[in-house]
A protein has these predicted regions:
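Internal, well-ordered domain-core segments that constitute the primary functional module
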Residues: 118-222
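Bacterial N-terminal signal peptides that target proteins for export
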Residues: 1-7
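Extended extracellular/luminal ectodomain segments enriched in beta-structured repeat modules
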Residues: 108-113, 342-349
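C-terminal motif of bacterial Sec signal peptides marking the signal peptidase cleavage site
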Residues: 17-19
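Acidic/polar, low-complexity intrinsically disordered N-terminal segments immediately downstream
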Residues: 23-113, 118-125, 134, 139-146, ...
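Conserved small/polar residues in nucleotide/adenosyl-binding loops
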Residues: 356-364
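Proprotein-processing/basic-patch segments
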Residues: 23-28, 199-309, 322, 352-355
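Sec-dependent N-terminal signal peptides
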Residues: 7-13
Length: 367
């Protein structure tokens, strides 16, 4: 009885030991015929790479780039952009308040101020680097050229340009307090937006346009009419500083108005209650974005590269990649050799390969 009991105990332990394996990786393999067996192998082929200079790329984007950055290997990289300003369909300026009809809102039929605001949210490089930005008015309509080798000189006269303004700036504006920078509206959205602002002549870009809209309302019928007859766009570039490139989200042309504070129930201006100003009509000032760069209008970026990339591309010891426009790496694969060797094989997986500073002649096994 003891021997039988001991034998049963050993058998149970053995079954328990071999029965605890939960690996199902080979489950069912034994049921397959021998001809269905899968064998894995790797092979290698010689790959030749070379650098190709790319002077431009197609860039259909609503982001503008402005600034300059110098790299010790690739040399300098300079970015600027040109953009039209969108005019909403059947645009109309605010009207002067009519006390008889109780319509309109402005205190006078004038524009109190005009400014061009370049908004950005991110940048590349040194946030405290001193830079200077210039804005020029375009004198010729932009073509639908989305390539980064666009020549701005075709659209404004470099010898006799219309300069809208110059402003010194740093990407991170240290004059803005933390309270301003972190302020939010009633919905929790931040109200501060980094920007570079150019003050424009209110007569040329404000009151003249206001008068023109009354004489030729068809000029403000849509963006096409506005660009053809009123304002063709702006060219934004950096002409001082090295080490910072701004990623511009949009460009706004804003106008300042003085208006009456109207009681919405009666459509009559509120009366002031301050001592010395009793019973005077209550007024205020506001800035409004009237025209802006949007996806509906043309925006084109120009990227300029140092001549250093020509020397790097000619080097035969390495290949390089410099984007978005600069140097591409071209890899020549031995297609015929691959086809002949793998014609009867099934490729279940191909491991992707990335190239960075490769030697001109390498095999996949070296990567």
């Amino acid at each position: 009885m003891k021997v039988k009991f001991l034998g049963a105990l050993l058998l149970t332990a053995t079954l328990t030991f071999f029965g605890c394996d939960d690996n199902t990786g080979t489950l069912g393999i034994g049921m397959l015929p021998g001809s269905d067996g899968i064998s894995a192998l790797t092979t290698e082929f010689p790959v030749t790479t070379r650098s190709v200079v790319a002077d431009s790329v197609f860039a259909k984007t609503s982001t503008g780039y402005v600034g300059r950055f110098t790299d010790p290997l690739f040399g300098y990289y300079e970015a600027s952009f040109l953009t039209e300003l969108n005019c909403i369909d059947n645009f109309k300026f605010p009207e002067k308040y009519d006390f008889d009809k109780k319509t309109g809102i402005l205190t006078e039929d004038t524009v109190a101020g005009v400014r061009l605001v370049v908004f950005y949210s991110t940048w590349f490089g040194d946030s405290l680097n001193a830079c200077r930005m210039s804005a020029y008015q375009l004198q010729k309509e932009l073509e639908r050229n989305r390539y980064t080798n666009i020549d701005p000189a075709k659209y404004y006269d470099k010898l006799n340009p219309i300069l809208l303004g110059r402003r010194a700036y740093t990407a991170y504006d240290t004059s803005v307090t933390d309270e301003e920078r972190n302020a939010t509206d009633s919905y929790g959205n931040k109200t501060y937006y980094p920007s570079v602002t150019f003050t424009l002549d209110k007569e040329t870009y404000g009151n003249k346009w206001l008068k023109l809209s009354k004489e030729h309302p068809e000029y403000f019928k849509n963006s096409k009419a506005f660009i053809e007859n009123v304002f063709k766009g702006v060219y934004i570039k950096s002409d001082y500083g090295d080490g910072t490139v701004l990623y511009v989200d949009r460009v706004d042309l804003q106008m300042k108005y003085q208006f009456y504070v109207i009681d919405t129930a009666t459509n009559v201006p509120y009366k002031r209650k301050q001592a010395g100003f009793e019973n005077e009509d209550s007024t205020a000032h506001t800035w409004r974005t009237e025209f802006a760069s949007t996806k509906e209008v043309i925006q084109a970026n120009q990227f300029l590269n140092s001549d250093k990339i020509q020397k790097l591309a000619a080097e035969d010891e390495h290949t390089y990649i410099k984007s978005p426009a600069g140097i591409f790496t071209e890899a020549e694969l031995p297609y015929d050799d691959i086809y002949q060797k793998l014609a009867n094989d099934t490729l279940n997986a191909v491991k992707p390969v990335s190239y960075t500073h490769l030697r001109a002649h390498e095999t996949l096994s070296d990567l």
